[in-house]
Amino acid sequence: MAGRIALIGGDNPHAKGWLETATTCPDFSEVVLCGDWGDHGGRYDTVSDIKGLGQGPSVDMALVCARNVDAPKWAKQLLQAGIPTLVEKPVARTSAEVAELNAISASTGVFWSTCFLNRLHPAVVKMRDLLDEGTIGRLVSVEGRMVTSSVARRDPGHWLFQKETAGGGILHWLAIHTVDLVRFIARCNYSTVSAQTATLIESIDVEEIASATFGLQGGAIGHIHAAYALPRRYGDISMVFRGEKGDITWQSWDYAGRKDRLIIQSAVEPWASQEYVELACPAPGGGGYGGEMGTRFLQLFLASSRGDQSFVCDGNDALSALRFVEGAYKSAQTGKRVELSS
């Protein structure tokens, strides 16, 4: 049966895309808006606050697309109202705000999660399967790179570049995807982090460059480099997992644009007979945010909130990612390595 979804906020870079995804998703018969949606909200039913969602037909789920300073406030009200809720990453400015949402969810039994959409990416699914199959053996080394278009190209006056509204910079907003995927693909929690950050543009007060070295509880060590640093192209984005028997590289963006491909080199059959193997793992197309992946993400969350199946991530994953980010910031401030709890 088609459900009813509420989109909350509107002042988020992904809000318009998610609105299109929700509108075209076959699992929803109606979209209700709450917040500031401007010209995009003209054709939809609207409510002035969360209480208004309870005055009409029941809402099956909500998706919060708001500023980081506002998102946890919206989410808290939704969970207390008994509405299963997705919150755009990184959910909040601090891990304490995420922990509060987890506590409310535990006490009310209302499910919530964040939009770690890349967990559904075909390249990510394949990498995780390959590691599970022993293709690279015991994991020893990880690298992640999230280098993207410069702050100048992204509008320095945007709320994303002010600590009061965003909470942090490149590590907080974009590299949090990389932070999450390392843990997800490796099936291993972080143990330590050491980092340096830099803010080189005077008009912003969050980091535009971050470099973090980390340890995983399984013994591997790794590195994440993130930067708003490209004056022309969009991205230089990749991940590498190395083990005792091989390595796998995911080249997500390069000079030619998006090229979702895996490069596998392994001493394990059936890979050992070739020097290396390239596999194309493109993201499925489609409109809205994330194309078909975005649609599938909403469908899976709706089914999970109804108890039909488990979801691909939860509030604990959001908490782990933000604790890593905060640990990196603390390390950059103190010059010391920070221990991370699981």
Please describe what each predicted stretch is.
Residues 100-118, 138-142:
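Rossmann-fold dehydrogenase core element
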Residues 87-88, 112-114, 143, 224, ...:
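Hydrophobic residues in well-ordered beta-strands that form the structural core
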Residues 42-104:
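Beta-loop-alpha module in the N-terminal Rossmann-like domain of NAD(P)-dependent dehydrogenases
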Residues 1-2, 7-8, 23, 39, ...:
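C-terminal helix-rich "cap/oligomerization" subdomain common to oxidoreductases
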Residues 173, 180-256, 295-307:
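Contiguous beta-strand/loop segments that form the cofactor/metal-binding neighborhood of enzyme cores
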Residues 1-43:
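N-terminal Rossmann-like dinucleotide-binding module
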Residues 118-204, 335:
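Predominantly a Rossmann-like dinucleotide-binding segment in NAD(P)-dependent oxidoreductases
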Residues 25, 240-316:
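C-terminal glycine/acidic-rich active-site capping loop/insertion
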